[in-house]
Amino acid sequence: MKNLFGYEIIQTLGQGKTGTAYLVEKNNSQFVLKKMNEQTEDPQKTLEIFNGEKYCYERMSRIGSGIPKLFEFDEKNHFLVKEYIQGETAATLATRGAFCKDGLTENHFRQILDMSGRFKKVGIHVDYFPTNFIYTNSGELYCIDYECYDYNSEWDFEHWGIYYWLNKDGMRAHLEKGGTSKLNKPGTFKPFDKPFEELKKRVMELV
């Protein structure tokens, strides 16, 4: 296995807009190592983005639970190591449908509503796209992406994220082929909403 900063790489978990995440192992324990994308034309920008992840981790951790622990933060080499959360993403569950046994259940929705409420209480919202959330085998919910913003209702779970969680066919297309053409209204970062309003009402009644 390839070694990266003293960790053995098991597999690549994914590549995002700010970096690449790897499942790694050290001393018989597994972690997630995220190596930041290097902004070669603007090294200062790389550092700002990297430090932003730590800042978001600190803000998000104020809700008390549901955030992977940060174990290592290397400013020189621009990588961080955090707790590895095993389970299924909300995106995978969403492809099986809402309010069904093998998809997103009532309990799953209660948990994300509770978490989004806790984020709101500390004055932030996160990226509620369902790939950023994992339900563990023991039933716990984690937000695995260190990304947050000052609270804005336009981008919270109720007014933005929920529509991605309810768009079964769109999420399946996204996971299989990439792209957001079946998730977002053309030319926007806003999700299709009208087809899912009745389901949304059912979810929000759980609050």
For the regions a protein language model found, what residue spans apply to each?
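Conserved N-terminal boundary motif of the eukaryotic protein kinase catalytic domain
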Residues: N3-T12
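ATP-binding glycine-rich loop module of kinase domains
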Residues: Q11-T12, K17-N51
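Conserved hydrophobic "DFG−1" position in protein kinase catalytic cores
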Residues: L23, K35, E72, V81-Y84, ...
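Structural motif at the C-terminus of the N-lobe alphaC helix and the adjacent alphaC-beta4 loop
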Residues: Y55-G66
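Conserved structural core of kinase catalytic domains
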Residues: S65-H108
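Protein kinase catalytic-loop region centered on the HRD/HxD motif
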Residues: D114-I124
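C-lobe/activation-segment region of protein kinase-like
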Residues: I124, T136-V207
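Hydrophobic residue at the +6 position relative to the catalytic HRD Asp in the kinase catalytic loop
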Residues: Y128-I134
